[in-house]
Amino acid sequence: MNLNFNIKKDFKNIEVFPTAGALGAQIENVNLSDNLPDNIIEEIYDALLTYQVIFFRNQKFEPRTQKAFAERIGKPIVYPFVKSLDEFPEITPILKKETDINNFGGIWHSDTTYQEEPPMGTMLYGIEIPHYGGDTEWSNQYLAYESLSEGMKKFLNTLEAVNISGKARVAKTRSDIMKHASVGLKGDELRAVHPVVRTHPETKRKSLYVNEAHTTNFVGMTEEESQPILEFLFNIKLNQNSLVDLDGSQDQLQYGIIDAQCTILLMIITAKEG
């Protein structure tokens, strides 16, 4: 089996360092709040397509400059469940208080697959990060698909899956943050159907497009019938070298860009010291 793991690619205008064998890269000596020339933006985007998750250290953004940068990469949208900044509805603060016990995003997921047109990516800006914990993992869903047998690939390519916003486990991860910043939506209001295997519109590579947080069943099958196959697909990330981990405690002011079309992620729940 020939899996396409992370390889070093040369860039002319930016310094890119792969961070793991499966996906992820660190980009150095770029200030994202500057009015960067088009050739730099193009290479940043190329790095995103190549490595699926890219990180930038020591970034300082105001909401205005963060939105301006995001608009050069894609089209920012509004997250439907949590209150955003008043003047910048595309930016959603993710705040965890000392008394909160649930991690927002603390289940393997791809963002908002319950929407008819989910976003192509997500941008995360770590402003105040704990010295202990705060880690995030990503899984390369290209590799998840490529690890399958030809028979399983052929079968999955015929399927579509239902995705909803209100599965019990993901609703629980929102519970603390929605106490403080809910916009009033009920968890089961949003639903969409997507192919189980999607082809990336730019790289043309195939990847799995199901996730534990939102996918409930295959179209034409009950949840009970779908569950064994879905559980197998959900667990592929644990059975192969498809992961990268970001130790959030190492850097404040860290910026990440994720290609949501071919990755899933998990905000790790860390036990308290002592």
Feature annotation, model-predicted:
Residues 2-252, 258-274:
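Non-heme Fe(II) oxygenase catalytic core, chiefly the N-lobe of the double-stranded beta-helix
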